């Protein structure tokens, strides 16, 4: 978890540095819970499982995947936020600054994405939470690009919200793995395959 304590000097810089990174919340914890169930099953079949996380934020999913047995050298992550990239690198992960798959080469067994999924409104225009006017614009762009980076038998674990409208699942099969109602929405984690 990211520290927000402030003591002096360097700690003040840390507060500013970390304050720009999406911090784990209910959505992050729900996806981590799914990883705890899914990764052990996947590793039994493929001990050399490769993982790509788009939008790594604080690195919670990377840390979960590593603890569950995915080899560190088989984990790659991206984030559009350079501070998130630096933080994940400090945690020891291979992380690059990229807008979705723009700087990604290769194919992966497992792709994770906890996207910005809320519809934009006049009160919340944050890049790390809003996914466009309908909330689905970033997700749809991700789904269009992901097929080029997913191995034939690979799968995507994607988090969405009941508030997200018009997700284009064309060309994919999806299965809802879990859901959780919180406040004004329902969060869902989907297993997505080509």
Can you annotate each of these PLM segments?
Residues 42-46, 104-106:
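Glycine-rich phosphate-binding loop signature in dinucleotide/nucleotide-binding domains
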